[in-house]
Design a protein with these regions (language model features):
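Metal-dependent enolase-superfamily TIM-barrel catalytic cores that perform enediolate-based chemistry
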Residues: 117-233
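Metal- or metallocofactor-binding catalytic centers and their adjacent structured scaffolds
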Residues: 5-7, 38-103
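Flexible C-terminal active-site loop/helix
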Residues: 2-15, 24-27, 33, 41, ...
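A cross-domain feature marking catalytic cores of carbohydrate-active enzymes
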Residues: 50, 122-125, 150-152, 178-182, ...
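Shared catalytic-loop signature of beta/alpha-barrel
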Residues: 66, 70-73, 219-238, 243-344
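Conserved, mostly hydrophobic/aromatic
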Residues: 3, 43, 59, 91, ...
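Glycine-rich, aromatic-flanked loop segments that form ligand/cofactor-binding clefts
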Residues: 92-127
Length: 368
């Protein structure tokens, strides 16, 4: 079964009211997404979605005629294009979806996984006051969620600490993860990053509160700073959601000594790369646990990878209602991915990633 064509479709989904993401200085009034369709010569299709795919024609030229089952070669070709251009990993993910459909197997099983569900942590997106965050966390707990991730974005962490402390005190049933949002910046955002001393002081406060992990308290490339944090504090340190290469992820594990490395399969390394990084993490007694904030398809791809590779008890699920509801997150999908009453989440049953786009339903949002 050979690859015959690669098609892309662009969409823009309006966000009204706007989403006030903690990591973005500008309100988000829409979300753009690209769906890639990889077709084989027998008519089987595979789908994935993420950011724009400006290299579609180049990838199509390099991949047409390739054996779709030779996913390592597909991965290698995407990697060579990624080096020179943008993040093209949704093509590799779509090929895995195609293979799953051809073999009538879910992707997590193709990847060697043996389970179909995993505990979810609800990943918040907005900055809100302590009372509102406690209210939202209590509602999530009552719905079965076992863990939440809280965002902050203040230069002075003391501004945000009362929110974290309130959740730990008033919703003690939840594991709490904290994202400092210092790893990277949005285009044009020149806000200074924390230094190692600031991050260490904050880490000690979170350790006192029993926080599960501290995520991205330093710039992603500050390997010496991460190593000092890892060796100087007792809390798990997580990083690497936006790395470009496997080498960067590997360096965070080895030189940076982070406990959790977080490359997103649709942004860095695809599913083959995730497996390699996860195995390295396991050998070092650490874990790979993916970032999943793109869209519903991105969450789905990372969920399949987590089922196969992750040794973390949780997987990230973007969910912060009413600002970021499951319906808002999954507008691109024909189904909504729900967290069960026992706190677990699964892909939809079926082959490949488990869903195929309903192009008629989302045609109203198409822009290209």
């Amino acid at each position: 079964m050979n690859i015959a064509s690669i098609e892309t479709r662009r969409y823009r989904y309006p966000l009204d009211p706007p989403f006030l993401a903690a990591w973005d200085p500008e309100p988000r009034t829409s979300q753009e997404a690209t769906i890639v369709v990889v077709r084989s010569d027998d008519g089987t299709e595979g789908y994935a979605s993420g950011d724009a795919l400006p290299d579609r024609s180049l990838l199509e030229r390099l991949l047409i005629g390739r054996d779709a089952f030779d996913v390592r070669a597909v991965h290698g070709i995407v990697e060579t294009v990624d080096f020179h251009h943008g993040r093209n990993w949704i093509v590799e993910v779509a090929v895995w979806d195609l293979l799953g459909r051809a073999r009538d197997e879910p992707v997590w099983h193709l990847l060697g996984g043996e389970r179909d569900r995993i505990l979810a942590y609800a990943s918040s997106g907005e900055l809100v006051d302590a009372d509102e965050r406690v209210r939202r966390c209590a509602a999530l707990r009552d719905a079965g969620v076992r863990a939440v991730k809280l965002r902050l974005h203040s230069q002075d962490w003391r501004v945000d600490l009362p929110v974290i402390a309130a959740v730990r005190d008033r919703v003690p049933e939840l594991d709490v993860l904290v994202d400092a949002n210092q790893g990277w910046r949005m285009p044009g955002d020149l806000t200074p990053r924390w230094d190692q001393a600031t991050a260490a002081e904050f880490a000690r406060e979170l350790e006192r509160l029993g926080v599960y992990w501290l995520e991205e308290p330093l710039a992603t490339d500050d390997l010496e700073g991460y190593a000092a944090l890892a060796h100087g504090t007792g809390i798990r340190i997580a990083a690497g959601e936006m790395v470009r290469t496997e080498a960067e992820a590997r360096a965070l594990l080895t030189t940076g000594s982070v406990a959790v490395v977080q490359p997103d399969v649709v942004l860095s390394g695809g599913l083959v790369g995730a497996g390699r990084i996860a195995r390295l993490a396991s050998e070092l007694d650490r874990t790979w646990s993916p970032h999943t904030w793109s869209n519903g398809y991105g969450l789905l791809a990372n969920l399949h990878a987590a089922l196969a590779f992750s040794t973390c008890p949780y997987v990230e699920v973007p969910l912060d209602p009413p600002a970021w509801s499951a319906e808002r997150r999954d507008w691109l999908l024909p189904v909504v991915l729900e967290i069960r009453a026992d706190g677990t989440i699964s892909p939809p049953p079926g082959s490949g990633l488990g869903v195929a786009p309903d192009f008629d339903a989302i045609e109203q949002y198409r822009i290209g």
